[in-house]
Amino acid sequence: MRRPKKYESGEATQYISRRAALRKLQLSLNDFRRLCILKGVYPREPKHRRRAQKGSSEIRVLYHTKDIRFLLHEQIVWTLRDYKIFAKKSNRDRAIKDFRNLKRRLALFPEIKLDHIVKERYPTFIDALKDLDDCLTLLFLFSTFPSLHLIPREQSNLCRRLTVEFLHYVIASKSLRKVFISIKGYYFQAEIKGQKVTWIVPHYYPFKPQSRQEVDFKVMSIFVEFYTIMLGFTNFRLFHGLNLAYPPQFPTNMLQDNEDTFKDESSFVSDRIAALNFELLRTDKVQEDEEELDIDMELLEQDGDSKRIIKMKQEAQEVARLRTLFKGLKFFINREVPREPLVIIIRSFGGKVSWDSSIFPGSTFDESDETITHQIVDRPSLATQYISRDYIQPQWLFDCVNQRQLLPTNKYFIGEKLPPHLSPFVDSKRDTYIPPEEKALHDPSLIETHEQSDDDSDEEAAQEEEEAVDQELLDAQLQLAYQQETAEYKKYGGPDGVNEDEEDPEEDEEDEDEEEEEELDEQAKRLKEEKQKMSVQSGKVHKVNKRQLHKAEVDEHRLQARMVKPRHRNLFRKLIREKQTKEKEEWLLRKKRRTFEAGEKEARKTAKRAARKEAAAAAAKASKLGK
């Protein structure tokens, strides 16, 4: 029997280094990276690196051997090899100045087709929706970039077109559920086919070029190349699910014959599509989302009234109310407010919106329209204001959507200090520190009240003492009335006031003597029992020794650590460190909260003192004038 050699089986054959993979595929490093990104192949971390590297302790980039075999049968490998041949021949034509042949070669430039890779990586439509988060975030980012060396203008325009099409679907389907503003940008979450899709739209700042060391645009552009194909397929499927024409089109009654349409109809239509303020053309006019919702509710009602069904009914009713949150409201967006994120929010929940026509095409009404209910402003003051509308800050829209109701606008007026903007993406049932504002968001009954002053607390204490004294007097009166009633009962011999012992005086006297003896015995027993009950005993104060409690907890923790198996100790230590980190963060947050509340309390006291001083000064001044 042949003795097996070392590193010919097991973990050593499961992994392959990147250099060996390049030799096997006959590709350059850049082409290999591109192929791995498109196919979804990533480096792997072995459990025992020394065994996987056949005894070498040098840290190398490793891949699964099966993944590299999988890449050997890919059609793109031949296209990437054709690039090398094309580059050599085109350089030769340039060198000999054969421009006729060079032009012919450029027309036959080899193109990579990624359709089969999208179908391969996402067998079902739901799989594509699950991986849509990173796709949308990256495409929204690239849609804001100008033309760069590694980012051609056509790629940025394609990203912009695909993202606008997706936003039109979100508006038409009313599938937006959560929104949030942060330093990174605007967070949006939509529910599509039962899947929650979250993406970030960056803030509209001027572009600042980055150095090569910070951002690798070449690798990012490869991801964008794949994600554009994927989102194109997804948009096509989503639009046809709502019976919308794809690519997006407008009804014929919207394309009026004016100077803009005569000049360039395609640019006119593209500008209106980018405005996100118009309904798109439908292939089937009969499209009622409310009917589908009613059908679903009927199906739920047939299933019974279990807790799960009741919860599903409540969620469906909340979503139905949320879809029409801004129905019947008209908004006007000022110049300083970012237009696109607010248009998405307002139109996704049934509202109407417009802006100044000089900012962007697609406005439907002017600022002077008297039917406007809300005007969104982000400046400290405004010169001209209308009485018929509310002037609010943009945060009001986001908070209304997250709380799923129209909030009062008095906290969001111009120049008002805004309430804290809480994230809806945080789990409300977590074990970490939850600020009181977030508790009030989920349960309005938990809103914290202001601390009472010393005068109010003294008045309440005096009132409680008076109530206690009244209760004692009432108990004494009831006890006296009971004693009088029992004495009358004994005196007259019964409840009817009839003395039955008058018929036989001798027997009555004997019975009375026996009853008196029994009553005396019972009274003696009662007195003994009452004395035992009313006896005062010296109590012992149970002092809690905090040091002993802490020591007991430490001993218990050490015992748990000893009970852990040796192979699980690293995991146990990691969990303990995470727990300690969370506790420390929670302690720091509570400390910050206490400092903040103490500062606010001191500020209120200072303001009260200043107001009292001003009032006293005004009174003194008035008294002097009166004299």
From Swiss-Prot:
Every BRCT domain range: 321-414
GO molecular function, one term: RNA binding
SMART domains xref list: BRCT
Comp. bias intervals (Basic residues): 540-549
Superkingdom per UniProt: Eukaryota
InterPro entries: BRCT_dom, BRCT_dom_sf, PES
Biased composition (Basic and acidic residues): 522-533, 550-559, 596-605
Protein's GO biological process: maturation of 5.8S rRNA from tricistronic rRNA transcript (SSU-rRNA, 5.8S rRNA, LSU-rRNA); maturation of LSU-rRNA from tricistronic rRNA transcript (SSU-rRNA, 5.8S rRNA, LSU-rRNA)
Keywords: Nucleus, Phosphoprotein, Ribosome biogenesis, rRNA processing
UniProt record similarity statement: Belongs to the pescadillo family.
Protein name as annotated: Pescadillo homolog
Cell location: Nucleus, Nucleolus; Nucleus, Nucleoplasm
GO CC terms in record: nucleolus; nucleoplasm; PeBoW complex; preribosome, large subunit precursor
Chain positions found as Phosphoserine: S453, S457
